[in-house]
Amino acid sequence: MEKDKTFKYNTEIIGTTKVHSVKSDYKIRIKNEITYKGLEDDLYRFNIVESLYALDDYEDPIMTQIAEMTNRICSIYKEIEIGINAEGIIEKVFNRDQIRDKWQKVKAWLTNAHPLESYEVIRAKEFELSNEEMEIKNIRFIHFLHQYFFIFRQSVDSGGTKYIKKNEMDRFGAGVVIPVNINLREKDLENGAIERNYEGKMVRDNKVIERLRQFTKDNYMHPEYKMTGKYVYDNITLLESDFTITEELGEFYYNHSYLRLTLEE
């Protein structure tokens, strides 16, 4: 991993959500620049700049308004400097002061643009920003951060399989953390690159299932959470990755997202 070298990535997200009787297709385009800044206190330090976030398609007008507020809040992280451990988990945010300065402007916009709808959103974000651990827990699920660092520095013995357990956040706003068992496989490609494939399935945790049932108000619902992906590396440079998440919470809640990340030439 070459220090101070910047790589540019394009991410395309295509998906479908269903909340009660409302079903929506959506498409998002994202561009990011990522620079490795070196090893500091056993953490890999990265500077990440988001140069584009475009919500190209979202059918439901109510969900569009929610997406608009969410995207504006996430804009405070358009430039973020983070410390990652060897497992790809964010452990430190180095530019928290700059992020808080940006939040004050976003907070003013939310108050003027959506005075009623944004009240609880603002209160929740203010609480999160006062708690670094909670802030890190949430920002790790920003699309690019989550996908890029998902199997950061993970590898398997030649011809073997590695088993990983990760905690995933549900995609419906319930705030439930879902344990997922992941099966990681690796193979060498003819061009010298390495391909890593994984499959992940939800662990049947009774406490998690109970919380999801409370959220959906369905005492008999059997949740499903599945993930699949492919990562291609040239040495330690990520060339491309496919990332699919499927979540189903009973009859009325469904989400399927396909994320495609490519290195810009």
Regions found by a protein language model. Give the residues of each.
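Acidic, serine/threonine-rich low-complexity disordered tracts
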Residues: 1-84, 153-265
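Acidic, serine/threonine- and glycine-rich low-complexity intrinsically disordered segments
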Residues: 90-201
